[in-house]
Swiss-Prot record:
This is Phosphoserine aminotransferase. One of its GO terms (biological process) is L-serine biosynthetic process. Binds 1 pyridoxal phosphate per subunit. GO terms for cellular component: cytoplasm. It is found in: Cytoplasm. The keyword Cytoplasm applies. The gene is serC. Pathway: Amino-acid biosynthesis; L-serine biosynthesis; L-serine from 3-phospho-D-glycerate: step 2/3; Cofactor biosynthesis; pyridoxine 5'-phosphate biosynthesis; pyridoxine 5'-phosphate from D-erythrose 4-phosphate: step 3/5. The modification N6-(pyridoxal phosphate)lysine is found at K197. The keyword Cytoplasm applies. HAMAP family: SerC_aminotrans_5. It comes from Pectobacterium carotovorum subsp. carotovorum (strain PC1). NCBIfam families: PRK05355.1, serC_1.
């Protein structure tokens, strides 16, 4: 059987070692004779899973002790509502940095609860799409917080700078780049991330929130989205997505065993460099993102002749390269190369691309 490399933007590829271990444990987890999916989330066995998962995540990201880690439902879209309702307090506005599709989606949700100050940071650099540097972001004085998305999966645009806005509360949607590189958590008030891209299976959402931001929720906020309630109940205010939590915990262990975030950052840069070199070195392919803002996680590219898109996708699947179709908003192709994607997968893709260009160029 041809080895399959899954380039899906999410739900995305998981480490093979993690999947194999989960397969082995599926029907008899921890010697209990039952699946981890079947045990109570309040059992001592699962409480140990939860505690180990949180500690490993804290170790990986070096999360300071004055931050809570929440394991939630609802995906990042739920956080689009949770963030303003937890953080606005008596204020009526917040700064929303619009750098792409998902950042703008957060704006659309926030408009239900406040008057967002939308700061469009999209720009053109020598005809290529990019994002203005943070020093040019015109933040307002009365905003309750600053919200931005460091990595846009659809646009393939990344903001690699870390925020330095003094005492402003910074909120970041790290759904597609969490754990891909080292970050300074202390620069943020809230970090949230859907698990299905670079952590584990769909159904789990991580929220990292600074302690002083708890307890400020508006009265109309649903309890299940209230950071204070979730923190007080150790993320078990209701039944959490236990299997997704368990698998994500296994991924945290895998990351630590493979050198942590410093090693992931190195590997991800190597994979991205290889793929962008293949695109830039062949007139048959094109990426229209400025080099400074190119994503290391999601690499969109266009063929010289869009009429060949269907053929490219058919042949790539036959070659074991799956889920390369670009998002409907931008078209073309997109290769998502998260932590679990091995270098061998990217090499296989670039070799296929070179061969396809020779045959169809």
């Amino acid at each position: 059987m041809t080895q399959i490399f899954n380039f899906s933007a999410g739900p995305a590829m998981l480490p093979v070692e993690v999947l194999r271990r989960a397969e082995q444990e599926l029907c008899n987890w921890n010697g209990l004779g039952t699946s981890v999916m079947e045990i109570s989330h309040r059992s001592k066995e699962f409480m140990q899973v939860a505690a180990e998962s949180e500690q490993n995540l804290r170790d990986l990201l070096k999360i300071p002790s004055n931050y809570k880690v929440l394991f939630c439902h609802g995906g990042a879209r739920a956080q689009f509502a949770a963030v303003p309702l937890n953080l606005l307090g008596e204020r009526s506005t917040a700064d929303y940095i619009d750098g792409g599709y998902w950042a703008h989606s957060a704006v659309n949700e926030a408009e239900k609860y406040c008057t967002p100050n939308v700061i469009d940071v999209k720009t053109r650099v020598d005809g290529l799409r990019g994002v203005k540097p943070m020093r040019e972001w015109q933040l307002s004085d009365d905003a309750a917080f600053v919200h931005y998305c460091p990595n846009e999966t659809i646009d393939g645009i990344a903001i690699e700078e870390e925020p330095d806005f003094g005492d402003k509360i910074v909120v970041a949607d790290y759904s597609s780049s969490i754990l891909s590189r080292r970050i300074d958590v202390s620069r943020y008030g809230v970090i949230y991330a859907g698990a299905q891209k670079n952590i584990g299976p769909a159904g789990l959402t991580l929220v990292i929130v600074r302690d002083d931001l708890l307890g400020k929720a508006r009265r109309e906020l649903p309890s299940i989205l209230d950071y204070q309630i979730l923190a007080d109940n150790d993320s078990m205010f209701n039944t959490p997505p236990t299997f997704a939590w368990y698998l994500s915990g296994m991924v945290f262990k895998w990351l630590k065993e493979h050198g942590g975030l410093a090693e992931m950052e190195k590997r991800n840069q190597e994979k991205a460099d290889l793929l962008y070199s293949a695109i830039d070195g062949n007139d048959f392919y094109r990426n229209d993102v400025a080099v400074a803002n190119r994503s290391r996680m999601n690499v969109p590219f266009l063929l010289a002749d869009a009429a060949l898109d269907k053929v490219f996708l058919e042949e790539s699947v036959a070659a074991g390269l799956h889920a390369l179709k670009g998002h409907r908003v931008v078209g073309g192709m997109r290769a998502s190369i998260y932590n679990a994607m091995p270098l061998e997968g990217v090499k296989a893709l670039t070799e296929f691309m070179a061969d396809f260009a020779r045959r169809h160029g």
